[in-house]
């Protein structure tokens, strides 16, 4: 089986590529920048140029492809409206998959996206899912909460650097998952017929609030942190401002997404059925506590070694 991965350089995409290669799949990666994607080629993947903003560049990537895994999304620095990638590009991708008679199309949505039509990113995801379901292309939609990896920059690093952690005062619990575990479940689903044309959650358990994550990071790092709260009213005001400027549309969309964090609704879902269908033991999926424990353990050891080496150098200079 040959897989085509879109968004292969991203946080989730690269883990999917690595897992697929480890499982013996042939992997093609549709990329915009061949130089920046060179590490994927070193792993054993084939790189093919393609850009979701240019539909005519997509179809050439589909030769010999059995299944598509689309892990792509627009980024804040991109100088165009997110709709260009997250809707138009996705529709072009699905149409190309249909023309190429691809056997399976895997797409990633966001938990509860159908409940927030006024939030651009959620609305775009819902529109793509709707189009995919009506396309006659066999699909799997995985609904995500968030990834452990994103919590490192948001909480762990500021705490280690003794800087303030910025939060929105949200009470929304989110079920995060390690991208390596997510990739394992995604690749596993390719060989399970009962996942066909299903929308399945892809989350960890339990769900965590910002306050709980900060408390855990403080415990594991042995450091207290200063918490700075961003008023939701300020986010709404910034959203209105950024929405008036074309080059800040993507920022406006992300600010709209941030507003829902104050809703209090849980971004989680039961995973029992998914584990059962895929034949996965839930104990194989790493918990946030263990993930952060391993992270802080490694970082604190490195810091300790650096401090020791600096102390030795100071002693030599003094002598």
UniProtKB/Swiss-Prot annotation:
Q: Name one Pfam family in it.
A: NmrA
Known EC number(s)? Answer: 1.-.-.-
Task: Mark the transmembrane ranges.
Answer: none
The signal peptide here is: none
* Subcellular location, record wording: Plastid, Chloroplast
Q: What is its main location?
A: plastid
Q: Which biological process annotations from GO are given for this protein?
A: photosynthesis
Q: GO molecular function of the protein, one example?
A: oxidoreductase activity
Q: What function does the entry list? A: Involved in assembly of photosystem II.
Annotated family: Belongs to the NmrA-type oxidoreductase family. Ycf39 subfamily.
This chain belongs to the protein called: Photosystem II assembly factor Ycf39
């Amino acid at each position: 089986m040959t897989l085509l991965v879109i968004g292969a350089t991203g946080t989730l995409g690269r883990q999917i590529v690595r897992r697929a290669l480890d499982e013996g799949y042939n992997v093609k990666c549709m990329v915009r920048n061949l130089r920046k994607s060179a590490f994927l080629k070193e792993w054993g993947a084939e790189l093919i140029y393609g850009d979701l903003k240019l539909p005519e560049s997509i179809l050439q990537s589909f030769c010999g492809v059995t299944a598509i895994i689309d892990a792509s999304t627009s980024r804040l620095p991109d100088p165009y409206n997110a709709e260009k990638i997250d809707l138009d590009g996705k529709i072009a991708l699905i149409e190309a998959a249909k023309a190429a008679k691809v056997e399976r199309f895997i797409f990633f949505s966001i938990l509860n996206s159908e409940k927030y039509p006024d939030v651009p990113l959620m609305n775009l995801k819902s529109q793509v899912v709707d189009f995919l379901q009506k396309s006659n292309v066999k699909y799997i939609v995985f609904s995500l909460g968030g990834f452990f990896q994103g919590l490192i920059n948001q909480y762990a690093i500021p705490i280690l650097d003794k800087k303030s952690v910025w939060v929105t005062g949200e009470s929304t619990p989110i079920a995060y998952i390690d991208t390596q575990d997510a990739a394992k479940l995604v690749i596993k689903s390719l060989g399970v017929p009962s996942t066909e044309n299903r929308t399945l959650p892809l989350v960890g358990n339990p769900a965590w609030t910002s306050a709980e994550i900060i408390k855990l990071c403080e415990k594991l790092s042995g450091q207290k942190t200063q918490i700075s709260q961003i008023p939701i009213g300020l986010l709404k005001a910034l959203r209105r401002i950024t929405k008036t400027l074309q080059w800040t549309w993507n920022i406006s969309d992300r600010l709209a997404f941030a507003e829902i964090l104050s809703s209090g609704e849980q971004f989680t879902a039961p995973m029992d059925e998914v584990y059962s269908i895929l034949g996965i033991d839930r104990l194989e999926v790493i918990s946030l506590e263990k993930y952060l424990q391993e992270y802080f353990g490694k970082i604190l050891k490195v810091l300790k070694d650096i401090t020791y080496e600096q102390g030795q150098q100071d002693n030599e200079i003094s002598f």
